[in-house]
Amino acid sequence: MDSGSLEKSMPNTISIKEARLDNDALSILIVADIDFERFEEFAEPLARALDCEVRERQWGADRHQWLLNFEGSQLWLHYEFYGDICWIATETKADIEVLDYLMTLIRPLLMAKGSYE
C-alpha cells in the first residue's frame, strides 16, 4: 500500500459539531459524527490535534475508553454508542486548566462558529 492510500484510509482531520467545557464534571463534551466501529478514525486525529499521547485503548460492546496523556496530565477520552456521547475527562480538579487549554485546540476543529462555550 502506498502512502497516498494510507492517508485516504486514515483521515488527518476531524469535524466537531460542538464542544463544551463542563467545569463541574471536569470534562469536555464533544458532539461529532462518530462511527463506533471506526472510532480510531475519529480518536487518533483528535489525539494528534490535542497533542496528546494515546497510552491505552479499551473497548467493549458499546463503549470506547482511551487513556490520553497531555504533558503529564492523564485524561480519558470516552465514547458510548447507545447514547452517542463523547467526552474527555480528568479525575483531577487541578487539570481543569488543561481542559480549558484543550478547548482552545478544539475550536479550530469546529464545523461552525459559535459551537462552543
Feature locations, PLM:
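Acidic, proline/glycine-rich low-complexity IDRs
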Residues: 1-10, 50, 55-57, 93, ...
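Negatively charged, low-complexity tracts enriched in Asp/Glu with abundant Ser/Thr
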Residues: 2-59
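Short acidic/glycine-enriched loop/turn segments that link adjacent beta-strands
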Residues: 23-24, 61-64, 83-84
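Amphipathic, interaction-prone secondary-structure segments
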Residues: 48-76
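Short, compact, well-ordered microdomains
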Residues: 67, 73-106
